From Swiss-Prot:
Protein name from the UniProt record: ATP synthase subunit b
Keywords: ATP synthesis, CF(0), Hydrogen ion transport, Ion transport, Membrane, Thylakoid, Transmembrane, Transmembrane helix, Transport
InterPro entries: ATP_synth_b/b'su_bac/chlpt (IPR002146)
Compartments where located: Cellular thylakoid membrane
Gene (name only): atpF
One cellular component (GO) term of this entry: plasma membrane-derived thylakoid membrane
Role according to the record: F(1)F(0) ATP synthase produces ATP from ADP in the presence of a proton or sodium gradient. F-type ATPases consist of two structural domains, F(1) containing the extramembraneous catalytic core and F(0) containing the membrane proton channel, linked together by a central stalk and a peripheral stalk. During catalysis, ATP synthesis in the catalytic domain of F(1) is coupled via a rotary mechanism of the central stalk subunits to proton translocation. Component of the F(0) channel, it forms part of the peripheral stalk, linking F(1) to F(0).
Organism: Synechococcus sp. (strain PCC 6716)
Major subcellular location class: membrane
Xref: PANTHER family: ATP SYNTHASE SUBUNIT B, CHLOROPLASTIC (PTHR34264:SF3)
Membrane topology, as annotated: Single-pass membrane protein
Taxonomic lineage of the native organism: Bacteria, Bacillati, Cyanobacteriota, Cyanophyceae, Synechococcales
Amino acid sequence: MDAVILMATEEVGHFGLNTNLLETNVINLAIIIGVLVYFGRGLLGKTLGDRQQQIATAIAEAEERQRTAAARLAQEQQKLAQAKEEAARIREAALVRAKAAKEELIAKAQQEIERLKQTASQDTSAATERAIAEIRERITALALAQAEQQLKERLSHDAELQRTLVDRSIALLGGK
């Protein structure tokens, strides 16, 4: 209902659109553009100046961050190169130590082999000497046993030989 009242009042006061372009629109547009240029120039200039300053500050900050990042990158690349050199040095030192340890182990193994050979040789020599001594003892015992046997046989068969042997033995001991 309010809308109906509003429409009724508009018709009464002749409120409506004037369709004559020359009378209304060009003048209105000129006034609006003039007001916008007069008041908007300062506001637009200030806004554009502020925006230009913000952009310049952002560019300067970005350039500073880029320089800082480039410096950090250079430092990190230098650290990486040093770390690679250190790793290569450590690797080389480890290879040298491994080679020395290998050579030391080989030398110790050779010494142990030589020691075992000498021990085996000494054991063999000792065993040979023991065997030879044992054989000599057996041969001596057998020879004595055989000589005793032969002596008993001769003495029991030959009384004259027995007397001669007793006389010689007494003479040797300092008898007659």
